[in-house]
């Protein structure tokens, strides 16, 4: 919570704004001294306004006038265990309505879209970094991204909130405007490791191989591979498969070397910083092809390659 307000106050004099948290839970984001702050939730035990933020969202529901300067804050619930304020939403039998234009596969994306309807001047909330950096997720944000742009951010580890699998969360500050995916790829995200992350700084394996089942695209098949999503998924999943399956990625001879690269990337994946977890598998294609024979045969050559690939980031290589 402190980091959220530190980020917000760097850009905004918040004293002149009403603060609203539409899924306030234990009111963690409303504990600061402030002249006007409003909390709401669907849980009657919260002691806040009992309002469903995802059904017919409008300012008057919260007693906020149309011309009132407004900032939305908080940690809205999303589809994992790290939404620490609203974990109860998964534990209790809450049944609540969601407007059709707000519905999404992820509850957090529904909340972001609901914020846009309330037209605050700023939005400063925690949510998974994957909402922004995964293009498929970003496209789901249309109602939100067409009216707000990312102004500032800090990437933090989910370990700050939970002991479950680690992944990157972003404390994100948005202002009125619009953004596209190219803006996100250019954005330099500061991290809690004292480093930065920029998608455009890297090349990705998806530019060279198929990540998902591709039976119709591959004729002569020399092997099979487990479907891929991101680096965190690679840590959990297999690489090469001993037998074909309907969901397997088929490997052609000319692409085999890249799947071997992915196999070895899996070995070092736990040693790179958590904030790479939702990215596609990273590669420096020119550098890799230059040493490909040594890379496949010599562990030391692979280690030197990966050290250069992640230079400037706190890795745990031997």
Cite the ranges covered by each PLM segment.
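Conserved S-adenosyl-L-methionine
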Residues: 1-71, 130
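Conserved acidic residues
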Residues: 17, 70, 121, 166-170
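Short catalytic/ligand-binding loop motif for oxyanion handling, primarily in non-cytosolic enzymes
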Residues: 30, 47, 80-83, 131-135, ...
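Internal, well-ordered alpha/beta segment that forms a basic, Gly-enriched binding/recognition surface
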Residues: 72-86, 108, 114-115, 123-124
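Mobile active-site "lid"/loop adjacent to the S-adenosyl-L-methionine
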Residues: 82-104
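Conserved Class I SAM-dependent methyltransferase catalytic core
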Residues: 101-158, 172-173
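Flexible, glycine-/basic-rich loop-and-beta segments that form/coincide
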Residues: 165-221
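C-terminal target-recognition/interaction regions appended to catalytic cores
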Residues: 221-318
């Amino acid at each position: 919570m402190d980091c959220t307000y530190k980020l917000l106050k760097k850009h905004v004099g918040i004293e002149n704004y009403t603060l609203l948290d539409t899924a306030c839970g234990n009111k963690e984001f409303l504990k600061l001294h402030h002249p006007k702050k409003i909390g709401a939730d669907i849980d009657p035990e919260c002691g806040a306004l009992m309002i469903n933020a995802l059904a017919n969202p409008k300012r008057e529901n919260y007693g906020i006038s149309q011309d009132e300067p407004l900032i939305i804050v908080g940690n809205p619930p999303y589809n994992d265990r790290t939404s620490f304020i609203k974990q109860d939403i998964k534990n209790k039998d809450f049944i609540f309505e969601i407007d059709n234009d707000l519905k999404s596969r992820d509850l957090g994306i529904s909340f972001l879209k609901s914020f846009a309807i309330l037209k605050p001047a700023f939005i400063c909330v925690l949510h998974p970094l994957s909402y922004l950096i995964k293009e498929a997720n970003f496209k789901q944000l249309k109602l939100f991204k067409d009216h707000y742009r990312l102004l500032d951010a800090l990437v933090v580890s989910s370990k700050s909130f939970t002991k479950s699998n680690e992944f990157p969360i972003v404390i994100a500050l948005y202002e009125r405007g619009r953004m596209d995916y190219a803006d996100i790829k250019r954005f330099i995200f500061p991290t809690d490791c004292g480093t930065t992350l920029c998608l455009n700084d890297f090349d990705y394996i998806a530019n060279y191989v198929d990540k998902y089942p591709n039976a119709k695209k591959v004729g002569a098949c020399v092997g099979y591979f487990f479907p891929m999503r991101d680096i965190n998924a690679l840590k959990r999943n297999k690489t090469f498969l001993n037998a074909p399956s309907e969901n397997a990625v088929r490997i052609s001879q000319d692409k085999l070397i890249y799947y071997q690269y992915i196999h070895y990337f899996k070995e070092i994946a736990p040693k790179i910083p958590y904030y790479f977890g939702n990215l596609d598998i990273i590669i420096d294609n020119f550098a890799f092809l230059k040493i490909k024979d040594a890379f496949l045969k010599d562990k030391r050559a692979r280690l030197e390659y990966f050290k250069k690939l992640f230079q400037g980031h706190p890795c745990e290589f031997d």
